[in-house]
Amino acid sequence: MPNEQLRRMDAFTFPSYSIDLATGEALFDYALTGPDGEQRFTEVITLPLPAEPPSDATVATLGRVLELLHVVAGVSYYKAAAPRRLVLPAPLGEAAAALVTAVYTKGLAEYAYRNQLPHVLELTPEIPAGSVPPAREYDNSDLRPLSAVGGGKDSIVSLEALRRAGLDPVPFSVNPNHVIVAVNEASGLAPLAARRRIDPVLFDLNAAGARNGHIPVTAINSLIAVATAVLNRLGPVVMSNERSASDPNLVWNGHEINHQWSKGVEAEGLLRAALAEHAGLTEPYFSLLRSLSELHIARLFAQIDRYDDVVTSCNAAFKLRDASERWCRDCPKCRFVFLAMAPFMPRERVVHIFGGDLLADETQIPGYRELLGVDGHKPFECVGEVEESVVALSLLAEQDQWRDAPVVRALVDAVPETAWSAAATSDVFTPGGPHHIPPPYAKALAQ
């Protein structure tokens, strides 16, 4: 479909969804419609199957979760044209409607900013009138947790905390790559995985110049995880999103633009409320690390060494052809994670993990200046707060093994006195801020 036809699309709809419980394959249909006709899409999500057939109660609850997933996953296709009308397929309660509205506005805020589409930030879904049958309560709070694994330090810290606390976690991922497979193998735990197949038509449209950009993928993967947990009679989905995920990158047209919005505490609260209201789940989903800073998590990771040869937090590495290359060593994530780990490890260990020494590489100085708030705004990446970077630098400047590293010397001279003053009184190692961690799980981090 030519781009000019896409630009004339005036509505996005959700024709149908279905699931085959014999295979775990769910089909989600979407349509962009306009004066020139429609563009249809079908997404395929395959859930891992349980050993025993699910009960009627499980199937009913799963159906309610999939109704939310159908609407939320549509964000991938909506963005190809960003029409002004978002027409939902069925009535929703207040909490579910709030989630959907936020996913398509706040979740697409970076996309709207980069594509200069302010109307996306004001989008109001059209929800059919009618009542929603009340959900039957589904108590999963005492079942084994499904712990999302992304291959990075955060999910490893959560997985090991749950294991130490005797909570017997099940590792989970969507479309696991070689990094995640290696982390699962290092854990020694039996994982579950779901498969998500985006309609290839979308890639064809993107290649032809359709609108594209960042989506709230964590919201989609979180609902896939909840669906997997319900189908497999598992307990809460445990994520590893930290408190800096709630920190916006910038403000545009009066709206906060946050690359990590769907990892933030607001999105977590909206998703929990929607799942409780629409699916009856008593304890659906939370982030175990929500009250911790990235720097605090890095300190906890330093106490675990079984994953040194497999861990990566680098998004670019997932795209590298050489499976042995786990870090690109030239992106905001690599810079930040190296900076966060370095104060808590021998230099040889962190250099071994990364396959190189970023603080000896002077070409990294401009990127580090952004992380430290000296130049530009916080990068559109999943990185910690500026204050955390300054605190990490202050710790390195006090250590014999790091203080003379070329990048450390250059950055110490670049950081303004006001930032040093803030770092001196920082609370980055004090847990705090809003969270949704249930009391039995809060103890896991204190083990």
UniProtKB/Swiss-Prot annotation:
Coiled coil: none annotated. GO terms for cellular component: cytoplasm. GO terms for molecular function: racemase and epimerase activity, acting on amino acids and derivatives. It is an enzyme of class 5 (isomerase). It catalyses: UDP-N-acetyl-alpha-D-muramoyl-L-alanyl-L-glutamate + ATP + H2O = UDP-N-acetyl-alpha-D-muramoyl-L-alanyl-D-glutamate + AMP + diphosphate + H(+). Keywords: Cell cycle, Cell division, Cell shape, Cell wall biogenesis/degradation, Isomerase, Peptidoglycan synthesis. It comes from the Bacteria. The lineage of its organism: Bacteria, Bacillati, Actinomycetota, Actinomycetes, Micromonosporales. InterPro entries: MurL (IPR043689). Cell wall formation. Catalyzes epimerization of the terminal L-glutamate in UDP-N-acetyl-alpha-D-muramoyl-L-alanyl-L-glutamate. Belongs to the MurL family. This is UDP-N-acetyl-alpha-D-muramoyl-L-alanyl-L-glutamate epimerase. The keyword Oxidoreductase does not apply. The keyword Transport does not apply. Transmembrane segments: none annotated. Pathway: Cell wall biogenesis; peptidoglycan biosynthesis. Its EC number is 5.1.1.23. GO terms for biological process: cell division; cell wall organization; peptidoglycan biosynthetic process; regulation of cell shape. HAMAP family: MurL (MF_02209).
